[in-house]
Amino acid sequence: MAFRRQVKNFVKNYSDAEIKVREATSNDPWGPSSSLMLDISDLTFNTISLSEIMNMLWHRLNDHGKNWRHVYKSLTLMDYLIKNGSKKVIQHCREGFCNLQTLKDFQHIDEAGKDQGYYIREKSKQVITLLMDEPLLCKEREVACRTRQRTSHSILFSKRQLGSSNSLTACTSAPTPDISASEKKYKLPKFGRLHNKRNVCKAGLKQEHCQDVHLPTETMLSQETLPLKIHGWKSTEDLMTFLDDDPELPLLATPPSIVSPITCLSEAEEVCNLSGADAVPTLSENSPSGQRDVSLDKRSDGIFTNTVTENLLETPLEKQSAAEGLKTLTILPACWSSKEEFISPDLRVSKSDSTFHNQASVETLCLSPSFKIFDRVKEIVINKAYQKPAQSSIQMDDKILKTTTRVSTASEGASSFSPLSMSSPDLASPEKSAHLLSPILAGPSFWTLSHQQLSSTSFKDEDKTAKLHHSFASRGPVSSDVEENDSLNLLGILPNNSDSAKKNISHISSSHWGEFSTQNVDQFIPLSCSGFQSTKDFPQEPEAKNSISVLLREVKRAIARLHEDLSTVIQELNVINNILMSMSLNSSQISQSSQVPQSSEGSSDQI
């Protein structure tokens, strides 16, 4: 059909306006496009093109029979031109009013027995009503004018967005200029007023999108809302931008929730079981200097709580309420600065930046790279710049060691995180560190939990008890009398680098935690190491294997979480599928029930 129409256009030498009218009123089984009708309406403002358009329309309206689509599409195009075209179109239509009156009796039944003339009769009645009712015609033309302005604005807006994206790709460093930013700033109040008049806007949109059928009883926009809508509601893109620019309601500040220790430890145990390895983190690589700087920044995987109370323990810890949960004692030297505290020459903890986030979990504690410094003593290696020749005696000055407690706010059983392994800054030599750790390990009533076998200790959380199989250090009661004797004279305790002292040092494996007790030492350090040796004694191959194993654990954990997410998505899709199936069944039943009365009415009419 299209090829035949093109040949006919070429043979009869039709003008551009006539070709467009013929295409809009063709015999194709679809309606004319809005862009084509818009072009034809623009041509009506030209006198020559207007006469050509109207002559072709009247010629198409005189068709009958199988060319009933010519008539219907001509009425549709005429209705569009009356609303959007020149006012001279209205004069031409009123001059041929009698031709429109004859179309009210148009009859045509196709081969399938369907009355196709019904739509032509109804459309002709609408056009005649529009031509006779002057106020209705004015309102329809105003609505069409606003629609046209909004459409043109949306086209310009899309072109501006395209130009800005092209400039962004051309120069990525230059910021993209937002042309309509000032307009959005001043149009927001007007958009708020339009939002209050929701019903009026809905009525206008209904008329703009359904231009083929316009009933006189439809709700029309008042003259007062015309400038508001022209300036405040230019396109749907502006509406979307306004919604994006609206300030969000402030969320209620909720205190950080403390994760239950049993739940956290159970999750960590599952991760350990999946990976088939220990939960104790290992160092990924050895740096050339052997130094590690740990800075507890404000990250999403922060572990330590910022509710640390630096108060001396004046009463035994057994008398405290069970609702406060378990607390971990961490020994902090009194000579630390306000901003940064040096736990050892290699370990630096920023006190001002350490925070607690409710997103933290024991899994991140076990597998986070920032805590790999606490795995083994061999990795907490003093830099060569701090190393000093071995001395015959090492004496530690009197330093008051303050104890701090991390208080958990959860009403249930609260959990304490892994304490830091700390030593004095004076312990500069790796050879002396082994001798200095043996008296420090022996703390009064301090004990640490076993890493793999911890069946004797349990947390009481209402009626539930769970055994902990992880390397989290706990603490025992500390008396106030012991705190008075904080000074430590290592000269009287340790011999001068003798072989007997080296033999007496207990080598604690990385999979067990020891239990120590002495009389007058107010300090403990949980250790998980295979031996007190320098980094030169340890090969680097096992550490590389450990780093690979840690990465494999993280990959396995990510895959497991992805599998869980996919399973939930599949379940939701199944639910949606079931709902859609039920809706389709209901619609089919309704259609069948509606067909039954129609068939009964048809039989009664035949009777």
From Swiss-Prot:
Organism of origin is Homo sapiens
Give the Gene Ontology MF terms in alphabetical order: clathrin binding; phospholipid binding
Q: Name one Pfam family in it.
A: ENTH
Q: Where is the ENTH domain?
A: 9-141
- Which key words are in the record? Coiled coil
Tell me which GO cellular component terms the UniProt record holds. Answer: clathrin vesicle coat; endosome; plasma membrane
Its GO biological process terms? endocytosis
What positions belong to coiled-coil segments? Answer: 543-574
- InterPro entries linked to this entry: ENTH (IPR013809), ENTH_VHS (IPR008942)
**UniProt name for this protein:** ENTH domain-containing protein 1
